[in-house]
Amino acid sequence: MNHEFSIDGLFDFLNAGVSAFHSTAAAAAILEENGYQNCPESAAWQLAPGGKYYTTRNGSAIMAWRMPKGPLTGWHAAASHSDSPTWRVKKLDCAEDKVFAKAETEGYGGMIMPSWLDRPLSVAGRVLVETESGIESRLVHPDRAVACIPNLCIHFNRDLNNGMKYNPQVDLQPIFGAAGGSLRAVLAREAGVKPEEIVDADIVLCTREKAERLGLNGEYFMSGRIDDLECAYTTLWGFLQGRGEEEGRGDVWVMFDNEEVGSSSRQGACGTLFADVLSRVEESLGVTKEQSIRARTNTLLLSADNGHATHPNHPEKSDPANPIVMGGGILLKTNASQKYTTSGFTGAAFSAICKKAGVPVQTFANRADVPGGSTLGNLLGHQILMPMVDIGLGQLAMHSAMETASCADAEYMAKAVAAYYNTPIFQPKDGEWKLGL
């Protein structure tokens, strides 16, 4: 990867990540370009000191790591997620209708529903194809508009602008053109197979707009899927800048799936991907249980997921004492109910690394009367007991079909994560860090 961070590289990743499967494939391609070797989970792994590897699970989650060059003493690790709120196609075969080609969908995650209306949409995901030897996955994404979700005109709904409660089953079903059209046939052509060879599929709707700079000076940008592909790409970039100068430290980067629906899947943060890979790496190194616990204690894991910037039209929705400014730096996310993993201990360490790197940090906290959401860190903590810090970048219109964020913040995140992967971290005793700043 280019040693200079480029916002265009982030845009390419956002444009490529039209589904969790495509996000994972895009990350895998970047890793392979940088010398990382694929290790299928079902294969026996032959891992070498200092080696660079990655594995995928379900084709929608991916984990990469650099092996330590000497006896294991600790880890660097950053986690993000590959999925975004969207609409899942229930089945490929269009429903019978005399006028339109229809394929029913259901909501995935907590999207802003009306943001999907009246815009050109495509589909993306994977089809499972029957072959002579079994079943094969193939990514599909027609590079054109194939669907839309039409609004009910104002003449039939005079109260539309006074607030409407959308019923996903009734108001938000897409059309795929005129009656007689076949979504299965379109995807079969994309996959290079016959329609009858598609056994099953995982398909979602996706926006057609490309990532684009916004603002009189181009300081912001708009795109679909900023949450959380912005953090995924910037942490991956930072991970790839790690020089591996500490012989006993291993470096990890992971992008989970299904965060938007609770992470409770095999490929989600509540699954065992992270723990399984670490265990296999430690076993290859001959690490004892005690050595494993000590190494995981000498770790600061970054859970990276975006947060809400203070809205220009509704500043009252944010904590008045902690306004979040787009372009103001990385968010250090805190929550008294432990929805975020940041503590004074872990926040101090990350803040010190950012200060040394010249990266500004903003404290993110919800209003006391707003419960707020959660993210990867506290769920991943059910599997891996490492010190963690929740970070992110401020954005507007989270979970809309199109979101807005800051170009400067993306650069800040990339710079901070690169500094993190090149900073020795050691916990000599509980409540004390030694940082190689």
PLM features: residue spans?
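N-terminal hydrophobic/helix-forming segments and targeting peptides
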Residues: 1-437
